[in-house]
Amino acid sequence: RHSFPTRRSSDLQTEKNIFFLFVSFSFIGLIVYVSAILSLAFSRYITSLPIIFLSFGILLGAGNILALFSNKQKINFHFIFIVALIVGGYFTEPHHVVLSKSDPEKEVYKNRQQLKAHFKDWITERKLKLEDETRKEYPIYFVLADGGASRSAYWTASVLSRLEIETKGIFSEKLFCLSGASGGSLGNMAFYAAYHNNNRDTLLREVQQYLSNDFLSFPLVRLMGPDILLPLLPVQIVRDRAVALEQAMKSIPQENSISRFMKKDFSELLNQDDKERKKPIVCINCTRMQDGSPAVLSNIEVNKEVFGNRIDVLKLLNKGEDISVATSVVLGARFPYFSPAGSIKNQYFVDGGYFDNSGAGVVHEMILELQKMINDSLLINPNHPYKKIKFNVIHIANQPSEEIKIQKIHPLINDLAAPIKTIIGSYASQTNINDLRLYKNLLEIYKGDT
């Protein structure tokens, strides 16, 4: 017969104290975690790195509780949870793109200007300068902005702002199109909002101040928590991480013209008033997830005659529906895993960088069509003012252009990761090919003078 040592009451009390402290700290951590999920300001206050550690701790605790119940009840609750997620996904859609309401009898994007009409109106506003006999050429600027998260947004907006300041407003006067993907689109829109505020003295400071804000923490805490449960919820208590990113763009501690602009509907970018100065064309590039087709949100009509099979996302909206500027930017910046594909009528859209990370494709199609129109005009009248027009493409790259070093890879990487490495490499190659096609087209138009 075995005898077991009796535990001293002091040891039991110590264990109780430790357990009490553990539960107390866990409860405090849970309160902080839930507060970060619900409050944009609080998530920014505690910042991204603590959110990562806290979220992993909460998820680990939840996993251990499931394991405890599984062991006690002799039922695999982990398996039940995974099956519930799979089944629930067939009946819910947690990643709808958030649309705003407009006039219920009006399709706000139905009568957008086509490219040629917009170009003619844009040129008419500059007719006197174009016909000035002292001018030998009239440059028109197209901007391409590479994607690359917040870094590319900050870089793009800073470069554009510096151009505007150094040229004393001449740059924006001759700016015809802003095209970009992912963070590049955010940089384009930040500059667009700030320079429309008509204060060059504060332009650079304003865009840099806005883009220095923490846009990561709030969507990150949604990613590492409630987004896992969304397929199980018939009613969304909180929205997904993409909506959290939109909210972060719309609300900053010190509001400025850019954050106010992000709250506006994209329809405010349309050129609807004949008396209003023509706005530049905006192209926010994205990709349809189901088939990898290129898509774009633009303030002009994206028709098949000019843009081929490129999807015009705004045509998918019904009467009485609109989309905010922030939502539009996020739709083209749904970075792999960090943001889910956004759903509009069962069409899912992801980051523009999957297909074209610079926005060169849509600009190339514009220039082809406009140059054809210019050539037709010059055939009729060789002295037409169009002969002075010269298209200039400003490509704001996110990384130094250097040749990739081709070297041996480990056999295990070859066997296990070759498809992944090839797919990742194809994204950059597709963008480079689009950029090169545009460059060669400009070389051909201007006889090698770029």
Identify the residue ranges that each predicted region occupies.
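C-terminal regions of proteins
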Residues: 396-450
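Conserved alpha/beta-hydrolase fold motif
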Residues: 178-180, 393
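Membrane-interface segments at or immediately adjacent to transmembrane helices
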Residues: 87-167
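Alpha-helical transmembrane segments
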Residues: 1, 31-34, 56-69, 89-95
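Patatin-like phospholipase A catalytic core
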Residues: 137, 142, 153-157, 161-172, ...
